[in-house]
UniProtKB/Swiss-Prot annotation:
<feature type="binding site">
    <location>
        <begin position="69"/>
        <end position="70"/>
    </location>
    <ligand>
        <name>pyridoxal 5'-phosphate</name>
    </ligand>
</feature>
<feature type="modified residue" description="N6-(pyridoxal phosphate)lysine">
    <location>
        <position position="208"/>
    </location>
</feature>
<feature type="binding site">
    <location>
        <position position="185"/>
    </location>
    <ligand>
        <name>pyridoxal 5'-phosphate</name>
    </ligand>
</feature>
<feature type="region of interest" description="Disordered">
    <location>
        <begin position="392"/>
        <end position="419"/>
    </location>
</feature>
<keyword id="KW-0663">Pyridoxal phosphate</keyword>
<dbReference type="GO" id="GO:0046872">
    <property type="term" value="F:metal ion binding"/>
</dbReference>
<keyword id="KW-0808">Transferase</keyword>
<feature type="binding site">
    <location>
        <position position="157"/>
    </location>
    <ligand>
        <name>pyridoxal 5'-phosphate</name>
    </ligand>
</feature>
<feature type="compositionally biased region" description="Polar residues">
    <location>
        <begin position="404"/>
        <end position="413"/>
    </location>
</feature>
<dbReference type="InterPro" id="IPR000192">
    <property type="entry name" value="Aminotrans_V_dom"/>
</dbReference>
<feature type="binding site">
    <location>
        <begin position="205"/>
        <end position="207"/>
    </location>
    <ligand>
        <name>pyridoxal 5'-phosphate</name>
    </ligand>
</feature>
<keyword id="KW-0479">Metal-binding</keyword>
<dbReference type="GO" id="GO:0009399">
    <property type="term" value="P:nitrogen fixation"/>
</dbReference>
<comment type="similarity">
    <text>Belongs to the class-V pyridoxal-phosphate-dependent aminotransferase family. NifS/IscS subfamily.</text>
</comment>
<comment type="subunit">
    <text>Homodimer.</text>
</comment>
<dbReference type="InterPro" id="IPR016454">
    <property type="entry name" value="Cysteine_dSase"/>
</dbReference>
<dbReference type="InterPro" id="IPR020578">
    <property type="entry name" value="Aminotrans_V_PyrdxlP_BS"/>
</dbReference>
Length: 419
């Protein structure tokens, strides 16, 4: 299997596993305990806090550990709304945001803790340009005294589009509004400067940068901290903002992953950008320049990511015809629905064009040989999908072919045993 879906999740780095393992069976104490093992656990957590803060360009005291970016987004959005003035209840979110952010914002509007200018039950979407970057002019038009929060991602999970945070933060700050950035895909892949950009809140997750699943962080500036109300109540951990026994092993893994990412990010980015260019070149050469279209910016993009439309070939069918390559037709966090990508639709793609698009997201261990093989397999799959009769369900035919191949192999194995 050639795994090219690292924006969905990454394997845990063996060096991270090495840090985590002793914390399950040997150094397992609760960081809230006052005895020596508990204090050792506290030191482990605080070391990880410093490592995550360093990678994010933040201060350690600005890091709040959570169960992941989804919880962090809910804490950011719900926490700000809980303390917002009665006349300041609108939320503005980028149209291409991750489902975690969109879901949290829409839920706040549905529950009545937030409102939308048009009276709908969804948070207002800030338009994006055809390349997927946020339209700052549309943000400025929507800003008003009744806006509580602006949420815009640093880098998109489907197209890799990277937003310049400075004009977005300047627009929000000029109106005196709180600004939240989803840095989940950016952290560890491109430089993130939380304090320097002036963002109030940021959310992230360990499993996107070779750390464990089930741990993430909300980054909150000193000013934003005072605007947040906790969403989880209990023992008062994380300075009262996120109750619950700390996941020491997961947090330590997050810290180790952040430290490793800081050391390797520049070299990884250079190598992955070259491999993405090679992949695109090979596919265009094989299929023709008019048969492959780029979704997203040419340059302002994550170095490991490219989203391509294969004209006339459905993404699901291409995936079925290339089972040896793990690629994605959209966000893995959107519940696996059949709707076309909301990201590509917001960029102006038709439903058909969106359904013909696939995301390739490379990883730290991706090789040139894997890219050449993947390009060949995907190109073959695209050509096959186009050649198959429209009257034949492609996925059914592929399953039949795979079953026949499996039966043939089984017969060969049985014959070998008989002989």
């Amino acid at each position: 299997m050639i795994y090219l879906d690292h924006n969905a999740t990454t394997p845990v780095d063996p060096r991270v596993v090495e840090v985590m393992l002793p914390l399950f069976t040997e150094r397992f104490a609760n960081p809230a305990s006052k005895h020596a093992p508990g204090q050792e656990a506290t030191r482990i957590v605080e070391r990880a806090r410093r490592e995550v803060a360093s990678l994010a360009g933040a201060r350690p005291r600005e890091i709040v550990f959570t169960s992941g970016a989804t919880e962090a987004a809910n804490l950011a959005i719900g926490g700000v709304l809980a303390t917002a003035e009665p006349g300041r209840r609108r939320i503005l979110v980028g149209a291409t945001e991750h489902p975690a952010v969109l879901g949290a914002a829409d839920a706040a509007v549905s529950a009545g803790s937030a409102v939308s200018a048009d009276g709908t039950t969804a948070a207002e979407r800030i338009a994006v340009h055809p390349d997927g970057t946020v339209d700052v002019d549309d943000l400025r038009r929507r800003l008003g005294p009744d806006v509580a929060l602006v949420a815009v991602m640093a880098a998109n999970n489907e197209t890799g589009a990277v937003n310049d945070p400075r004009p977005l933060v300047e627009a929000a700050r000029s109106a005196g509004r709180c600004c939240c950035a989803d840095v989940t895909q950016a952290l560890g892949r491109v430089p993130v400067e939380f304090e320097r950009t002036g963002v109030d809140l940021a959310v992230s997750s360990a499993h996107k940068l070779y750390g464990p699943k089930g741990v993430g962080a909300l980054i909150a500036s000193k000013d934003a901290w005072s605007r947040l109300a906790p969403r989880v109540h209990g023992g008062g951990q994380e300075r009262g903002l996120r109750a619950g026994t700390l996941n020491t092993a997961g947090i330590a893994g997050f810290g180790a992953a952040a430290r490793i990412a800081a050391e390797s990010m520049a070299d990884d980015g250079t190598r992955q950008r070259a491999l993405v260019a090679l992949l695109t070149e090979l596919l265009v050469k094989r299929l023709g320049p008019g048969a492959v279209e780029l979704n997203g910016p040419v340059r302002a993009r994550l170095p490991n990511t490219v989203n391509l439309r294969f004209v006339g070939a459905g993404a699901d069918e291409v995936q079925a015809c290339a089972p040896r390559v793990a690629i994605s037709a959209g966000s893995a966090c959107s519940g696996g629905g059949d709707e076309p990508s909301h990201v590509l639709r917001a960029m102006g793609r038709t439903a058909t064009e969106a359904r013909e698009s696939l995301r390739f997201s490379l990883g730290r261990a991706t090789t040139t040989e894997e890219i050449r093989t993947a390009a060949d397999l995907v190109a073959r799959a695209v050509l096959r999908v186009r050649s198959l009769s429209q009257s034949t369900p492609i996925q059914d035919e592929v399953r039949d072919d795979n079953r026949a191949s499996s039966n043939s192999l089984n017969r060969g194995s049985a014959a070998s045993k008989e002989s």
